[in-house]
Amino acid sequence: MESELKDLNSNSNPPSSKEDRPLLKSESDLAAAIEELDKKFAPYARTDLYGTMGLGPFPMTENIKLAVALVTLVPLRFLLSMSILLLYYLICRVFTLFSAPYRGPEEEEDEGGVVFQEDYAHMEGWKRTVIVRSGRFLSRVLLFVFGFYWIHESCPDRDSDMDSNPKTTSTEINQKGEAATEEPERPGAIVSNHVSYLDILYHMSASFPSFVAKRSVGKLPLVGLISKCLGCVYVQREAKSPDFKGVSGTVNERVREAHSNKSAPTIMLFPEGTTTNGDYLLTFKTGAFLAGTPVLPVILKYPYERFSVAWDTISGARHILFLLCQVVNHLEVIRLPVYYPSQEEKDDPKLYASNVRKLMATEGNLILSELGLSDKRIYHATLNGNLSQTRDFHQKEE
């Protein structure tokens, strides 16, 4: 797809005659084209002060603020964040030093043959307690360093859900009219909307769950060991053998394990499959819902005035730079009650996913969108083409 998009956006063999060359669009035409794209691909469009792809233009006052932050906040925050990362890596290294990693029964096929999932999340005892508690604490400290000094968390009144969905409560009335409390079912997964890589830090600080990650993450310096302590599910999307179970199969097993085994790590899933600008909720993939177990919906919102921390069209380097430059960042969290599926939802994962998605959109005041990752890639490729035309236009004017 990427090669096709490149063919659409550029010509490898430009015409030799000047008359045959396509005229460059005026700057106003390009601005109108980008505005039209933003409307079509609204879930991925940036609406903050930093503009499309974070490229501005910036007001003079903003340039001054960025210049001051570059020589004050950025170096300090960078050093502190790297120190925290290194400290937690050392904690994980020390407390897993004489422990063999857990090798799950699930297998995946890659170029090197059959490989096993490996993690330290199945450890028990005081060593595991130290890893989890220090991980949660340092994740919150890291968010503080990034400017998230306060995180507002809210839990909608669970009592309001008792009439509409009796399964959301574990308290029943016995024959004598007394409240008989039963132990609630453990959710098989936490499901959340996906706005930024910062989502992971929040969830680590709140519940320290496992995540789905590329297999290459497990081999990264520092982060690789930390991901194993989280119990990440590593996937190799390029591997497709006859026995390959795929991402859904592996996730399904982990969800069932987390639901039935209290000592197993809870798994955290972003069913949208990609990030948005935080105002929309994309179509959910069914991986978190195939097992038919209860899920815990969590909604993350990042209010902003200048720079939006949503990771939509902006590059990773620019995003981190502007994040470190912003003095204060905001995060609001809505933790919904555990959602217990009906029998109909258990039998139909798509219905289950759709109903949870609608609930999250209603409670989080999010707009439903049917776009997906492929649309985001098209949007990015088209934006890159238009912006390259803008650069050509300015060069011609000069």
UniProtKB/Swiss-Prot annotation:
Superkingdom of this protein's organism: Eukaryota
Residue numbers covered by motif HXXXXD motif: 194-199
Pathway(s) the chain acts in: Lipid metabolism; phospholipid metabolism
UniProt-annotated location(s): Endoplasmic reticulum membrane
Keyword vocabulary terms for this entry: Acyltransferase, Endoplasmic reticulum, Lipid biosynthesis, Lipid metabolism, Membrane, Phospholipid biosynthesis, Phospholipid metabolism, Phosphoprotein, Transferase, Transmembrane, Transmembrane helix
Transmembrane stretches, start-end: 66-86
pH dependence, record text: Optimum pH is 6.0-9.0.
Disruption of the gene: reported phenotype: Delayed senescence. The double mutants lpeat1 and lpeat2 exhibit impaired growth, small leaves, short roots, reduced seed setting, reduced lipid content per fresh weight in roots and seeds, and large increases in lysophosphatidylethanolamine (LPE) and lysophosphatidylcholine (LPC) contents in leaves.
Compositional bias of kind Polar residues: 163-174
Top EC class for this record: transferase
Catalytic activity: a 1-acyl-sn-glycero-3-phosphoethanolamine + an acyl-CoA = a 1,2-diacyl-sn-glycero-3-phosphoethanolamine + CoA; a 1-acyl-sn-glycero-3-phosphate + an acyl-CoA = a 1,2-diacyl-sn-glycero-3-phosphate + CoA; a 1-acyl-sn-glycero-3-phosphocholine + an acyl-CoA = a 1,2-diacyl-sn-glycero-3-phosphocholine + CoA; a 1-acyl-sn-glycero-3-phospho-L-serine + an acyl-CoA = a 1,2-diacyl-sn-glycero-3-phospho-L-serine + CoA
Region (Disordered): 1-24, 158-185
Function: Possesses acyl-CoA-dependent lysophospholipid acyltransferase activity with a subset of lysophospholipids as substrates. Exhibits strong acylation activity on lysophosphatidylethanolamine (LPE) and lysophosphatidate (LPA), and lower activity on lysophosphatidylcholine (LPC) and lysophosphatidylserine (LPS). Exhibits acylation activity on both LPE and LPC. Has a preference for 18:1-LPE over 16:0-LPE as acceptor. Palmitoyl-CoA (16:0-CoA) is a better acyl donor than oleoyl-CoA (18:1-CoA). Among several different acyl-CoA species the best acyl donor is palmitoyl-CoA (16:0-CoA).
Family in the record: Belongs to the 1-acyl-sn-glycerol-3-phosphate acyltransferase family.
Domain notes: The HXXXXD motif is essential for acyltransferase activity and may constitute the binding site for the phosphate moiety of the glycerol-3-phosphocholine.
Protein name, as recorded: Lysophospholipid acyltransferase LPEAT1
Naturally occurring in which organism (per UniProt): Arabidopsis thaliana
Name of the coding gene: LPEAT1
